[in-house]
From Swiss-Prot:
Pfam families: YopX
Subunit structure: Homodimer.
Protein name (Swiss-Prot/TrEMBL): SPbeta prophage-derived uncharacterized protein YopX
Gene3D superfamilies, per the entry: 2.10.70.50, 2.30.30.100
Species of the source: Bacillus subtilis (strain 168)
């Protein structure tokens, strides 16, 4: 079984399905991302790197979404849209939908039935997408 994850090494994002990657997690929670080079696993980054981040993902509506993803949510009538940061909280991926919904402030990503959700980036590689967003 493959579990979707991505790792930010401070400069580049590495995804679970990148060729040759192997994620090793110790019982104490420490982790190391390694890449296979000529039959040898070579460390790429690990949890001791202060710029590194390990993020788990889930497939929602056919697209992988991760903690700290940036999404554009557009109402079904296409009259309003909002750019939001996805946060993993209480076991679910959540977004603030208060600007496009009178009924909800924060909702689980899978429950956004009245709108289209498009992953447009993440806070590591595209922080400018959140400029001006409250």
């Amino acid at each position: 079984m493959n579990t979707a994850y991505r790792v930010w090494d401070g400069e580049q994002m590495h995804y679970w399905d990148d060729e040759g990657l192997s994620l090793i997690i110790k019982s104490n929670g420490d982790w190391t991302l390694k890449r296979l080079y000529t039959d040898v696993l070579v460390p790429v980054v690990d949890s001791t790197n202060r710029n590194a981040a390990l993020m788990w993902g889930a497939k929602v509506r056919g697209k992988f979404i991760y903690d700290r993803s940036i999404v554009k949510i557009t109402s079904d009538d296409k009259e309003s849209s909002d750019v939001c940061e996805v946060k993993f909280s209480d076991g679910v991926f959540q977004v603030d939908v208060s600007k496009i919904s009178a009924d909800y402030d924060v909702t689980a990503v899978g429950w956004v039935e009245y709108a289209t959700i498009e992953v447009i980036g993440d806070v590591y590689q595209n922080p400018e997408l959140l400029e001006g967003v409250k």
